Design a protein with these regions (language model features):
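Alpha-helical transmembrane segments of compact multi-pass small-molecule transporters, enriched
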Residues: 38-42, 94-108, 123, 187, ...
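Structural signature of hydrophobic alpha-helical transmembrane segments
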Residues: 1-11, 55-72, 111-127, 150, ...
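Membrane-interface interhelical linkers
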Residues: 1-66, 76-85, 136-153, 186-235, ...
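Extracytoplasmic gate region of multi-pass secondary transporters
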Residues: 157-165, 169, 226-230, 236
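Residue-level recognition of membrane-helix boundary sites in multi-pass small-molecule transporters
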Residues: 20, 30, 90, 113-116, ...
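Structural motif at transmembrane-helix junctions in multi-pass transporters
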Residues: 27, 78-94, 172-178, 229-247
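Juxtamembrane helix-loop boundary signature in multi-pass membrane transporters
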Residues: 1-5, 100-166, 270, 275-290
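Small-residue-mediated transmembrane helix hinge/kink sites in multi-pass secondary transporters
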Residues: 19, 80, 106-107, 165, ...
Length: 290
């Protein structure tokens, strides 16, 4: 349980860092690219795997890691935009309620059961994402793009969770998770560098030194949030469904508190209802999976 609490705290802190990027005028994409370099280096350095760099492309999970790297950098940027445009609570709920996508995939692909209570949880999660997307009273969102960000984050995060589970269970051998994770971060970094080089060629790139510091600040907790979640999942007696749902509920609540007390974010009644519905939905799903 200690590992899970650490993961919740670190993951919630990621949303705070994204918000600070906006406050300090740090280029979000540049910082995210550096973040993935930092996370990849940490992963390769701390991995005890004897596989050499030359052998990584030959691993059965490499293609999956490459695709996940693309999704990681895309969704991470959407998460940053959602935190900055819609607030911490909207970003956290949109990303963490995407657990319902993994559940639907499990029912379809792994032929897991779908009870009435689980179905209620899925429906309530979708309602929660909608309610927390409201920014002002009596209005959904003044800018349609601002409403689009939470929706993209919801489906993008769900795609990552589902793909991670599929690739890890199908292709990653025991003890290979650190190297697999580091490879995902490395692929995301390479893609980010390609985009930065393109921006340099067309003359739209002005790299800022503070982006490096911002990326390091983001990369270290980003890596360890995954490490401690994996440690929590490997704890004896800790069911994966319980760990994931508790992790999601904790991040939603804690990131909302961060938004309220650190950035003075204002939540209208619909937002509070949405957050409450989110907690109820994920508790229902956890209850079914017990």
């Amino acid at each position: 349980m200690v590992y899970l609490l650490i993961s919740i705290c670190i993951s919630s802190f990621l949303f705070v860092i994204f918000k600070l990027f906006d406050v300090l005028k740090i280029n979000t994409f540049q910082a995210i690219v550096v973040n993935y370099f930092t996370a990849a280096v940490l992963g390769f350095f701390l991995s005890n795997n004897l596989v050499s760099f030359q052998e990584i492309p030959d691993q059965p999970w490499f293609f999956g890691a490459f695709l996940l790297g693309i999704m990681f950098i895309l969704v991470f940027n959407i998460m940053a935009l959602t935190s900055q445009k819609n607030g911490l609570s909207v970003a956290s709920v949109s990303s963490k309620m995407s657990v319902v996508i993994a559940i639907i995939f499990g029912v379809w692909y792994y032929e897991e059961s779908l009870s009435l209570i689980k179905l209620m949880g899925i429906v309530l999660a979708l309602v929660a994402v909608y309610l927390t997307s409201f920014k002002e009273k009596n209005a959904i969102v003044q800018n349609n793009k601002d409403f689009l960000y939470p929706v993209l984050l919801f489906f993008g995060s769900g795609a990552i969770d589902t793909s991670l589970k599929y690739v890890e269970t199908s292709f990653v051998a025991e003890g290979g998770v650190p190297l697999f994770s580091a490879t995902i971060f490395g692929c995301a970094f390479i893609l980010g560098v390609i985009v930065l080089l393109y921006q340099k060629i067309i003359g739209s790139l002005s790299f800022e030194l503070k982006s490096i510091f911002g990326g390091i600040l983001l990369g270290v907790p980003n890596y360890f949030s995954i490490v401690y979640l994996l440690k929590a999942l490997s704890t004896e007696g800790m069911e994966s469904s319980t760990a994931f749902t508790l992790n999601n509920v904790g991040i939603v609540i804690l990131s909302t508190l961060f938004g309220l007390f650190i950035f003075n974010e204002k939540l209208i009644r619909k937002n509070w209802v949405g957050i409450s519905v989110a907690v109820v939905s994920i508790l229902l799903i956890m209850f079914v999976n017990e």
